[in-house]
Amino acid sequence: MTTTLPAYDEVVPRYEPVIGLETHVELGTNTKMFCGCPTDFGGAPNTRVCPVCLGLPGSLPVANRAAVEATIRIGLALNCSIAQWCRFARKNYYYPDMPKNFQISQYDEPLCVDGYLDVEVNGEPVRIGIERVHLEEDTGKTLHVGGATGRIHGATESLVDYNRAGIPLVEIVTKPIPGTGAMAPEVARAYVTELRDVLRSLGVSDVRMEEGSLRCDVNTSLNPPGEQWGTRTETKNVNSLRSVERAVRSEMIRQASVLDAGGRIVQETRHFHEETGDTTSGRSKETATDYRYFPEPDLVPIAPDPTWVAELKAELPELPRLHRRRLQQEWGLSDLDMQSILNAGAVELIEATIAAGATPAAARKWWLGELSRRANETGAELADIGATPGQVAELQGLVDAGKLTDKLARTVLEHVVAGEGSPAEIMAARNLEVVSDTGALTAAVDEAIAANPAIADKVRGGKVAAAGALVGAVMKTTRGQADAKTVRELILERLGAQG
């Protein structure tokens, strides 16, 4: 039976959404959570493994201190209380991606609890409660062969790569978020965006959603206004900020259509499809009882020294909200401008470019324009694109000095990125400097006027807009190395016209 889906703006007046988010963050440690295997991305399948992460009999885990420290720093940045005593637990389930048939996680005694993260949505502050931040190990990666787009449906066989098994993973769980109404999808996206920025500022993870180092599960439920919260569903592994927003919106619409038809919502996991924006049923949702948690007998409890925790708190960097506020005041930026910089990961690059002598506007122009475009085209990180903040500041200095036009500067920048030298060296070696010889420019202008008498007459007659064609002719003659403004002024002067 085909169900007609309601429009989104019809959902919220009749139902109140409650959302919650669970994010898994791969920590950027050198070794895995409970063994010494490297955590580098890639490598031939099943080559970065050992008896511990393969769960072989007789192997014993040892907790990674660097992962514990990173988790405490995350908890402090999220305003959590750090437990005086916590322990690991076994989460029991049978699936090929975890060869031990259990995952080492934390259950009733996590490392960090009861925090919050403040976000802004449409200029309105929203405080998101944090239930817990705990440590666990990642699973292996399953590849389904023969099915559609790598899914298990229709697959003829499944392969498992255990290189990822045992990588330190932090799970950050929000408290239920009611009362957001129609803004629920935007609130979800704002939370994940802010969390990503916090994690990036801490340097604990590269937080690349597209590579799986930041994975998000979205819980959604609806209830009629004033009534008990509804049954929630969990949309798994949403892998982009845009998809977080779309997944909440899609699930709200779907649940409303089920409730409108007199049906009931089943507690289950669902899969979000990027291409359609829809969710489809996965499996019934397990409860904690299904996993039969019990304390991990092979690991001692962790009792962070209060002095150590205090030192970590004192060493926290300036967090994104405070950083944005300071930069906006110093640079005169709008919220949108600041978010663009953060999304591009360009804050430090722009700050360094300004420190090297460029204006905030010029620094933003290059890093968010030409260099971001090139990074997107090549898939490189902006910081690894091949241009340094000092070179960008030097390039802008040549523009400000009238030695390069913006167009010529873009050409020079291409060669800078290619590693050919500094902007000044490239400008000289490739003869790209703006033509400043007045005699040569005047000759080029006179040539353009002589070659285009009809246009010249229009300009003499007061139609100065027609001078653009003459400017173009001069720019062609000088191979784009003349300053267009100077050329236009010279044309009007030669034709006795007023601009």
Swiss-Prot record:
UniProt keyword annotation of DNA-binding present: no
Single GO MF descriptor: asparaginyl-tRNA synthase (glutamine-hydrolyzing) activity
Cross-referenced PROSITE patterns: GATB (PS01234)
Enzyme Commission number(s) of this protein: 6.3.5.-
Superkingdom of the source species: Bacteria
Enzyme class (EC, first level): ligase
GO BP annotations listed: glutaminyl-tRNAGln biosynthesis via transamidation; translation
Catalytic activity: L-glutamyl-tRNA(Gln) + L-glutamine + ATP + H2O = L-glutaminyl-tRNA(Gln) + L-glutamate + ADP + phosphate + H(+); L-aspartyl-tRNA(Asn) + L-glutamine + ATP + H2O = L-asparaginyl-tRNA(Asn) + L-glutamate + ADP + phosphate + 2 H(+)
Nucleotide-binding listed as a keyword: yes
Keyword annotations of the record: ATP-binding, Ligase, Nucleotide-binding, Protein biosynthesis
Pfam families per the UniProt record, alphabetical: GatB_N, GatB_Yqey
Function, in words: Allows the formation of correctly charged Asn-tRNA(Asn) or Gln-tRNA(Gln) through the transamidation of misacylated Asp-tRNA(Asn) or Glu-tRNA(Gln) in organisms which lack either or both of asparaginyl-tRNA or glutaminyl-tRNA synthetases. The reaction takes place in the presence of glutamine and ATP through an activated phospho-Asp-tRNA(Asn) or phospho-Glu-tRNA(Gln).
Quaternary context: Heterotrimer of A, B and C subunits.
Family the UniProt entry places it in: Belongs to the GatB/GatE family. GatB subfamily.
PANTHER family: GLUTAMYL-TRNA GLN AMIDOTRANSFERASE SUBUNIT B MITOCHONDRIAL AND PROKARYOTIC PET112-RELATED (PTHR11659), GLUTAMYL-TRNA(GLN) AMIDOTRANSFERASE SUBUNIT B, MITOCHONDRIAL (PTHR11659:SF0)
UniProt-listed HAMAP family: GatB
Record's protein name: Aspartyl/glutamyl-tRNA(Asn/Gln) amidotransferase subunit B
Originating organism: Salinispora arenicola (strain CNS-205)
